[in-house]
């Protein structure tokens, strides 16, 4: 496709998505609800439209940008990060009322900072929609900046980015000069940037500020794996199973099971957790789901959304099960195994050992229960162009973050395939029958079944 054709296609997709969002916001506004934002629980069509606008906007920028535009964008983003770090360091955001404007000098007095610096820094962030100046000399929160006061974890994530990850990233070349190719966790860009022999994991245990910031950064900057799992798994042909039991092994939440049982009335889900306390978390999660679906009162009909959600929760069972222990559910049609994702604390060698233990625990069941399937779900590094550019950019970002902080890397698809092929089962082996990845997610599902060894 030519450059002009790609421009036209992106512009058309963006216009369609923007129209969908505008219609949703207008409807919300007419209903007496805030109409200037898209809530997380908006219809899937609207959330997809939002992602389409973001993706196509970035595609258009890439298609049109000249070298000078590229340098200028990097310069702006560099200054925005520095400004956000400055605002966070002096607690400036907390000095601005959530619902009103205030004079710059009053904020400067409260934060004990020079008013001229505050004005220049705030006006830079305003160009990105962070804060606003409703009238000359007065500053106020915007829809983008207010959550950083209401949810301090957002500011923690930004501070980790500016104080820890950015310096580490900028020392990547020096780390390569000093150590070359290495897998040692104490010889990475983080160590070079902060002149320490302690690994990132060790530093986390010693520095409370870093210990508080990392989970926030991981949550908001590295993205939600569970959403990606649901995106991939809901595309499988569940209807073909009929009335069947599905086991979600070592799940962190019951969200996937809740989504699938609500959509497919013939499925029964067993959700297994490694920790006892998770059951309480899931109970609260399921209660919240019922409330969200209007189940705090008896459903008005047997066919409405509330009634369907109530029936779905009846087909969902929670269990505790230790990692690698024998599987007590032996008659399921599908076993969903979550292969953990790489992190500064978990290398591929550790993930492989955990996955091997789980695969071995299910191997005999697959051999005895002909027709049972195993689905291994994980996050892998996509091949260039395999997913949307925004998804690939996040995947590359995660991979480089792991390298800079701990000399760890994201998994390759070939490594997961090799892992499945390495599982030995009496009288046969696991055979990969399907790989499923969507262009909107970094998650991938590997479907495998037992195949008897041919004699002779």
Swiss-Prot record:
Principal location listed in the UniProt entry: nucleus
Cellular location(s): Nucleus
Record function comment: Transcription coactivator involved in regulation of the dothistromin biosynthesis gene cluster with aflR.
Residue ranges of domain HTH iclR-type in the record: 74-143
Keywords: DNA-binding, Nucleus, Transcription, Transcription regulation
GO cellular component: nucleus
PANTHER family from the UniProt entry: MONODICTYPHENONE CLUSTER TRANSCRIPTIONAL COACTIVATOR MDPA (PTHR43712:SF15), PUTATIVE (AFU_ORTHOLOGUE AFUA_4G14580)-RELATED (PTHR43712)
Induction (free text): Expression is 8-fold up regulated when aflR is deleted.
Gene from which this protein is expressed: aflJ
Full protein name: Dothistromin biosynthesis regulatory protein aflJ
Region (Disordered) residue spans: 290-314
Phenotype of the disrupted gene, per the record: Strongly reduces the expression of dothistromin biosynthesis genes such as hexA, hexB, pksA, adhA, vbsA, dotB, ver1 and dotB, and the subsequent production of dothistromin.
Residue ranges flagged as DNA-binding region: 104-123
Compositional bias annotation for Polar residues: 290-300
Family annotation (InterPro entries): SAM-dependent_MTases_sf, WH_DNA-bd_sf
Annotated Gene3D superfamilies: Vaccinia Virus protein VP39
Origin superkingdom: Eukaryota
GO molecular function, one term: DNA binding
């Amino acid at each position: 496709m030519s450059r002009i054709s790609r421009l036209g296609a992106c512009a058309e997709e963006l216009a369609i998505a923007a129209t969908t969002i505008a219609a949703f916001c207008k409807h919300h506004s007419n209903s007496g609800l805030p109409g200037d934002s898209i809530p997380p629980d908006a219809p899937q069509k609207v959330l997809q439209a939002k992602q389409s606008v973001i993706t196509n906007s970035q595609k258009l920028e890439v298609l049109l940008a000249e070298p000078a535009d590229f340098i200028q964008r990097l310069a702006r983003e560099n200054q925005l990060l520095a400004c956000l770090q400055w605002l966070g360091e002096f607690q400036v955001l907390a000095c601005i009322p959530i619902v009103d404007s205030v004079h710059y000098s009053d904020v400067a007095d409260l934060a004990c900072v020079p008013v001229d610096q505050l004005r220049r820094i705030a006006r830079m962030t305003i160009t990105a929609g962070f804060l606003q100046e409703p009238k000359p000399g007065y500053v106020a929160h915007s829809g983008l900046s207010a959550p950083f006061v209401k949810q301090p974890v957002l500011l923690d994530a930004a501070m980790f980015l500016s104080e820890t990850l950015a310096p580490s990233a900028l020392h990547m070349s020096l780390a390569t000069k000093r150590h070359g190719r290495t897998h040692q966790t104490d010889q990475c860009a983080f160590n070079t940037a902060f002149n320490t022999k302690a690994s990132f994991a060790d530093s986390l245990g010693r520095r409370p500020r870093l210990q508080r910031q990392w989970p926030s950064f991981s949550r908001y900057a590295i993205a939600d794996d569970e959403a990606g799992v649901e995106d991939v798994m809901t595309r499988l042909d569940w209807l073909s199973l009929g009335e069947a039991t599905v086991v979600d092994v070592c799940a962190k939440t019951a969200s996937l099971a809740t989504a699938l049982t609500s959509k497919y009335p013939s499925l029964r889900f067993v959700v297994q957790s490694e920790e006892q306390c998770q059951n309480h978390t899931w109970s609260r999660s399921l209660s919240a789901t019922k409330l969200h679906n209007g189940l705090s009162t008896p459903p008005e009909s047997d066919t409405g959304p509330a009634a369907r959600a109530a029936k779905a929760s009846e087909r969902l069972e929670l269990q505790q099960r230790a990692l690698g222990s024998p599987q007590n559910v032996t008659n399921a049609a599908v076993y969903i195994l979550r292969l953990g994702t790489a992190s500064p604390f978990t290398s591929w060698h550790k993930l492989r050992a955990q996955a091997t233990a789980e695969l071995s625990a299910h191997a005999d069941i697959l051999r005895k229960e002909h027709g049972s399937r195993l689905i291994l779900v994980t996050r892998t590094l996509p091949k260039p162009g395999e997913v949307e550019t925004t998804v690939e950019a996040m995947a590359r970002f995660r991979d480089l973050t792991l390298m800079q902080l701990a000399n760890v890397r994201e998994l390759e698809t070939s490594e997961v395939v090799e892992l499945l092929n390495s599982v030995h089962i009496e009288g046969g082996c696991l055979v990969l029958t399907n790989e499923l990845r969507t262009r909107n997610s970094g998650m991938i599902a590997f479907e495998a079944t037992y195949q008897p060894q041919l004699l002779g």
